[in-house]
Amino acid sequence: MTRKLKEPHRQAVNGAYLSVMNWFFCFPRKEVSLNDLRDEVSVFDERYAKTTIRTAVSQLENEGFLQRQVLGRTWRITTNLSHSYHRSFKVGHNLTIVIENGIIEDVLEEYPQARAIILFGSYRKGDDTEESDIDIAVEISGTADPQMISLGALEHFGYRRKVKINGLVFSREKIDLNVFANIANGIVIYGFLEVKP
């Protein structure tokens, strides 16, 4: 006999599923117990019941995203860093947070002449970790030499705090070809980045 979840419980499990996934996107190298995970994901979200978190963890484990080791009565939960969610869902997660936090507007305020703003590096690829900084490239007109700048820090990046934002301001005329190739493989979040063969 198959039992269906009642609608409020199904919504809680779906919310917990996303919260657990997002927590491991923010802390991909951490090992955590079930109780600690429940406390961690309840910081921003509603307070989830332990059984709801257990259901979400089991579902993500069945999908291969999480790995669980049972140590007596305790679970040690880690994420599978080679799972496709780190290259698909995590990139979308990162992009959403970057855009929703007003980074584009902040860059345009500082560089109104920006031709393009690009998210590149580890956040673009989805292989960022707890220690990673956000890398933003800003293309401007002219012949200025490339310049590394600090764009401040995001107070909250999902479950992480105070994530630094590094900027690379460059003009097409003065950028190293290898650096430009890295930027060109990023995601254009404002304007248009012309890539000439």
Predicted regions mapped to residue ranges:
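Short beta-strand->loop micro-motif that forms the acidic, two-metal-ion catalytic signature
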Residues: I136-E139
